[in-house]
Amino acid sequence: MEQQEEKRKIKAYQRKSKRSKSGSSSIPLDLVSEILLRLPEKSVARFRCVSKPWSSITTEPYFINLLTTRSPRLLLCFKANEKFFVSSIPQHRQTFETWNKSHSYSQLIDRYHMEFSEEMNYFPPTESVNGLICFQESARLIVWNPSTRQLLILPKPNGNSNDLTIFLGYDPVEGKHKVMCMEFSATYDTCRVLTLGSAQKLWRTVKTHNKHRSDYYDSGRCINGVVYHIAYVKDMCVWVLMSFDVRSEIFDMIELPSSDVHKDVLIDYNGRLACVGREIIEKNGIRLWILEKHNKWSSKDFLAPLVHIDKSLSTNKFLLKGFTHAGEIIYVESMFHKSAKIFFYDPVRNTSRRFELKGFTDDEFVLSNEHGYTLHVFPNHVESQISFT
């Protein structure tokens, strides 16, 4: 009995000595993974440098996919001179105050800025797609990860034109992002496609089957592995909805539900694509045209609550920016100076809440631009630890 106990102690000592000599952590790697998943994205990126095993964990596709299942956030950006300011706020209801509790938040979360040239083109040409955003600076196409603050400059597509419309898609089956681009100055039956993360960053030519051109200000919308954008088909002299299956790289043409829809506003409504009608319905509401199965459309009317709560909150001063995954409509001030207002409206509960951003800009920028700044909003943004290095 004593000999068995002695052997057990010797084996325990040998295991401990082995761990000590190897210098490895005594924390099991699966527990390390659980701990890292509970940390903010900034901390995850920082702990990547602790050791090779930790770096391996945070760059594994499985770990990266788990990060995207966290509660989505509202990503906020604006450009002032050569500085590009970035912040984000949670979307879940517990964070905000209702209308009958007048309250303003004055501190932003993780505000930082990046330097860009004055030649930075219209922003943003794409939405946030599984944590990544693509935009254009001068003649360069750039993929941006707001979580890691990394930028990836893509090779220039063939052709001399800089007049490009850019789309970003994500295939949830294979876990791949793809960048699409086409010229908007003329009609074409081809599109250029590049797969991120491939060994060779090469643009491929994909046939669209229908000669069309997209609108420069159309950022498209990627939903369940399909990128949608509104396009003009010259041969038919009609505006249509084009779909691009990210995995199969096949285009399809879908008839629009009405000729009177906003051509620059596409929305993810409960996991389905929706267009916003231009017509004014009863009580200043909005009409959504929702794409159903077999490319059929249904319509749904929503009350626009702003003018009913406060007459000074005209819908002309606020823009519809989409829906949260919880079904709330997001309104954002079209222009702001030192503070910006964001409103959330739940049409089912008939409740509203607001978030006021104070101190978003420095005094020097407020004084230098009397017309104000445009706040770019990315609903349902998820964290991503995809690395470009």
Curated annotation (Swiss-Prot):
Annotated region described as Disordered, given as residue ranges: 1-26
Domain (F-box): residue spans on this chain: 21-66
Compositionally skewed regions (Basic residues) per UniProt: 9-21
Top-level lineage group: Eukaryota
Pfam families: F-box, FBA_3
PANTHER family: BNAA05G37150D PROTEIN-RELATED (PTHR31111), F-BOX DOMAIN-CONTAINING PROTEIN (PTHR31111:SF42)
Protein name: Putative F-box protein At3g10240
Species of origin: Arabidopsis thaliana
